[in-house]
């Protein structure tokens, strides 16, 4: 099963991706983790990404796409994966489609984790990160909405909405149900 998780910062995508990965026996692929592991391992792409990150710049989409494409080529992803944090834009969604088309496959499901803005604010403030001021959090939510709205339409045929308010187990049960598991 090939699954994309969408949702704003604080919706619990990473936590649910980990639980789904364990339950379904397929890898969780997080762009943040791809950056970290490639940088730690000193790969060519990792070193290139590090240059951007060290300068405080965003890593170009083409570089992120290449990291994801390389990761999807690994044997453990042959029978499925859970993408957490990718795609973030329509351009990346189209690039992902091309990556999978070359492999003769496609996305099976897209789960959108939905949480109210008030709940997200409360969750993100509770994390206690120094940079999580109301202004920063609200801006991250706006960026998410602006970038993700086109993705919801792009994936409309595979899209399932999951109410992400509740205990971890309640949200997990809803996610499994949305996947038909």
From Swiss-Prot:
Keywords: ATP-binding, Cytoplasm, Kinase, Nucleotide biosynthesis, Nucleotide-binding, Transferase. It comes from the Bacteria. It catalyses: AMP + ATP = 2 ADP. One of its GO terms (molecular function) is ATP binding. Pathway: Purine metabolism; AMP biosynthesis via salvage pathway; AMP from ADP: step 1/1. Its EC number is 2.7.4.3. The keyword Nucleotide-binding applies. Residues 126-132 are annotated as: LID. AMP binds at residues 31, 36, 57-59, 85-88, 92, 129, 140. Its main location: cytoplasm. InterPro entries: Adenylat/UMP-CMP_kin, Adenylat_kinase_CS, P-loop_NTPase. ATP binds at residues 10-15, 127, 166. GO terms for cellular component: cytoplasm. It is an enzyme of class 2 (transferase). It is found in: Cytoplasm. The keyword Nucleotide-binding applies. GO terms for biological process: AMP salvage. Residues 30-59 are annotated as: NMP. PANTHER family: NUCLEOTIDE KINASE. HAMAP family: Adenylate_kinase_Adk (MF_00235). Belongs to the adenylate kinase family. Monomer. Consists of three domains, a large central CORE domain and two small peripheral domains, NMPbind and LID, which undergo movements during catalysis. The LID domain closes over the site of phosphoryl transfer upon ATP binding. Assembling and dissambling the active center during each catalytic cycle provides an effective means to prevent ATP hydrolysis. Catalyzes the reversible transfer of the terminal phosphate group between ATP and AMP. Plays an important role in cellular energy homeostasis and in adenine nucleotide metabolism. This is Adenylate kinase. It comes from Mycolicibacterium paratuberculosis (strain ATCC BAA-968 / K-10).
């Amino acid at each position: 099963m090939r699954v994309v998780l969408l949702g704003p910062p604080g919706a619990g995508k990473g936590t649910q991706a980990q639980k789904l990965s364990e339950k379904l026996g397929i890898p969780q692929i997080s762009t943040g983790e791809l950056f970290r592991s490639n940088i730690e391992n000193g790969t060519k792409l990792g070193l290139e990404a590090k240059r951007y990150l060290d300068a405080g710049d965003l890593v170009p989409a083409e570089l992120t796409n290449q990291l994801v494409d390389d990761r999807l080529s690994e044997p453990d992803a042959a029978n499925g994966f859970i993408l957490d944090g990718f795609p973030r834009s329509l351009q990346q969604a189209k690039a992902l489609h091309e990556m999978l088309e070359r492999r003769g496959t496609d996305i099976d499901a897209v789960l959108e984790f939905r949480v109210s803005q008030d709940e997200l604010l409360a969750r993100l403030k509770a994390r206690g990160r120094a940079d999580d001021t109301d202004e920063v959090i609200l801006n991250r939510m706006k960026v998410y909405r602006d970038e993700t709205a086109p993705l919801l339409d792009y994936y409309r045929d595979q899209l399932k909405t999951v109410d992400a308010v509740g205990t971890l187990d309640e949200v997990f049960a809803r996610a499994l149900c949305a996947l038909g598991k």
